């Protein structure tokens, strides 16, 4: 974020895992699976919240060694739209058509997918322009202000599975 400060139209979001032992210190995040059949799954619920540019949370992000806590994302969309889009990624379709849960908040899984030549990041996450995943700045390129998708809609390319091995299974 230091290399490319937020524009006046942008907000910084944290996308968090409730299952991480790291326990990121973010106040009042929105549960992503609210209003789904998984709304009661508190122990593994992913969350999203707005992070102030001067938040102490960013110091925690810079110093944590944890790789499963979540990630940072920049968007011009509202918190509600960001949550709605990540909710649409609750499940994805494997090459054989089976719907599986997608750990979109976990950089260990998401980063190799976004780095794949077979995945157009701005189509997968159209409401996010850029982010920070496991200490790496990532350009997503999304500019959308709405999502409107319902899971499962994204099909994991076979080549992503082949190149990542068991890392994304």
Where are the model-predicted features located?
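Terminal low-complexity "docking" segments
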Residues: 1-103, 107-169
């Amino acid at each position: 974020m230091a290399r490319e400060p937020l524009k006046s139209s942008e907000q910084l979001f944290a996308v968090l895992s409730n299952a991480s032992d790291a326990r990121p210190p973010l106040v009042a995040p929105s549960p992503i699976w609210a209003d789904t059949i998984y709304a009661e799954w508190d122990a593994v619920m992913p969350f999203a919240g707005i992070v102030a540019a001067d938040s102490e949370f960013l110091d925690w992000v810079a110093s944590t060694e944890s790789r499963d806590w979540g990630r940072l994302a920049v968007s011009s969309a509202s918190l509600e739209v960001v949550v709605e889009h990540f909710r649409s990624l609750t499940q994805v379709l494997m090459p054989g058509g089976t719907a599986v849960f997608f750990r979109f908040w976990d950089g260990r899984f998401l980063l190799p997918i976004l780095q794949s030549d077979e995945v157009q990041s701005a189509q997968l996450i159209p409401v996010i322009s850029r982010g920070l995943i496991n200490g790496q700045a990532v350009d997503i390129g999304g500019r959308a202000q709405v999502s409107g998708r319902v899971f499962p809609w994204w099909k994991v390319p076979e080549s992503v599975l082949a190149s990542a091995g068991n890392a994304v299974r």
